[in-house]
Structures are given as structure tokens and as C-alpha cells.
Amino acid sequence: MLDYIPLTATAGRRLATAELRALATSRMEDLGYAYVGNEFSPANSGVRFDVVGVSKYTRQVRIYEIKSSRGDFLADDKWERYLPYCTHFAFVAPAGAIFRFELDRAVGLIEYGAPAFERMRRARRFGMTVLREDCLRATRPSRRIRDAVPDEQWIALLETIALGNRPGASDPSYEEGAGI
């Protein structure tokens, strides 16, 4: 099943990468993702996510890859390495930079600068257990994640996003929402 979520347009002007990143971050926060990070790189992974968010209640990890132009999209050959880390993945680009037929059905596309829709296929969710010590443990990750990412690396990713990726914030307690 696909979700169609209308976005507001910023019609008629070219958008810079920083502006696209700010729009994507704002969009993710509007969707209710409690922990949102920019330019995030999990330890020892060799990848860097433009915008990543972890939902506190639905146990979803969403990654947005920012593409400022068609050339930027065509030159990118690393985005498929991001898929094992998330339940939802989408490109964020100016309208017309990426064509829907160029993407796999499981990959979303958010276009700014024209009436646009985010198109996302629902991904299977995985279970987690949140311990009182504010430690996240993957209990039953999806097969895709289990095959591609070692458990220690997955736990470190979630800990970093949930606990250490908010500027000026100390480690929150369980009651303050450290659990996902």
C-alpha cells in the first residue's frame, strides 16, 4: 500500500541544498519523528544520511536523501547502501530533477517547487525493546536489516540518533522520551 501525503509548494524558484535540507527536516518533524538529525554518519558504516529521523511510537526510521539537481541524482551511486538502515527512504529534490519511473516502488520522492506528493510504500516494521537504562536493543529486526547491518552497529545507530543527536541536550531519561 502506498501513502500519498500532499506537500506545500514553493513554486517558481530554484532551491539550494541547505534550503531543501531545512524543508526535509521540518517535514520529518511535522510527521512526528521525535529524533531528527542532519548529516548523520553511523560509526564505522561508511555512509552519511542527509536527514534521518526515528519515530518514538511507530518504531520507524526514515531517511531523506537531498538532491539539489538532476546531475546530483545521476552522479549518486551510494544511496542503495542506506536502505538497510531504514524502514522508509525518500529523495528530496526540486520538481523535475528526478522522475518517478527512475525509482524503485519502495523509494519515495518528495518534490519541492511544484504541487507534489510523497509516495512511500509501507515497509515491514521491526520490534524493539527499550530498557530502563536508556539502551536500545533490536529484538527482531527485519531480515533486510539483520543481513546487512551487524546488531552492534544497528544499536549504536539508534542510540546515537535517540540520545546524542540533539544540540545542547544531555542524555534524556526514559520518562523524558528516550525510548523509541
Task: Explain the meaning of each model-derived region.
Residues S41-S45:
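A short beta-turn/loop motif at secondary-structure boundaries
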Residues L2-G32, V36-N38, F101-I180:
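Non-catalytic C-terminal interaction segments of nucleic acid-processing enzymes
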Residues L15-A24, V61-I63, S68, D76-K78:
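Accessory alpha/beta interaction modules
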Residues S68-G113:
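Catalytic cores of nucleic-acid endonucleases
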Residues F49-I63:
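Active-site beta-strand-loop-beta-strand hairpin of nuclease catalytic cores
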Residues M28-D30, Y57-T58, L83-Y85:
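Flexible, charged surface loops at secondary-structure boundaries
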Residues V47-F49, R105:
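Short beta-strand or tight-loop elements
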Residues G37-F40, A93:
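Short loop/edge segments at beta-strand edges and connector loops
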